[in-house]
């Protein structure tokens, strides 16, 4: 091979999107948007892929939902995503639920190129009033 010959490289044009993963103790919701966040490409939840309500927060349901969302995104032309993971936050859990890591792995295995993974759980910088009010729940 001479210096003037270069191998033919297939340069795939990357079309980026954002995968928003909201994972609580009750469900996992995966939304894929364009980079601006204005146009929703795919929205799938754990409850859409399982029959029983008790299976909605499971990692298996999150994995199936992520596969389905990835197929919809690939069909619309998005082949690379940045991932933003969110837990309930506020007065609830500060960490994502059990389906978050399974959904990230499923997005990576489904053929999407993964860019950044970021945690965007809303965390209060002071305290917030609990749902039962100032003096607590009186039974």
From Swiss-Prot:
PROSITE patterns per record: RIBOSOMAL_S11 (PS00054)
InterPro entries cross-referenced by the UniProt entry: Ribosomal_uS11 (IPR001971), Ribosomal_uS11_archaeal (IPR019961), Ribosomal_uS11_CS (IPR018102), Ribosomal_uS11_sf (IPR036967)
An example Gene Ontology molecular-function term: structural constituent of ribosome
Annotated Gene Ontology cellular component terms: ribonucleoprotein complex; ribosome
Keywords: Ribonucleoprotein, Ribosomal protein, RNA-binding, rRNA-binding
Record-linked Pfam families: Ribosomal_S11 (PF00411)
Record carries keyword DNA-binding: no
One GO-annotated biological process of the protein: translation
Keyword Phosphoprotein attributed: no
Complex and partners: Part of the 30S ribosomal subunit.
Job description of the protein: Located on the platform of the 30S subunit.
Protein name (database record): Small ribosomal subunit protein uS11
UniProt source species: Pyrobaculum islandicum (strain DSM 4184 / JCM 9189 / GEO3)
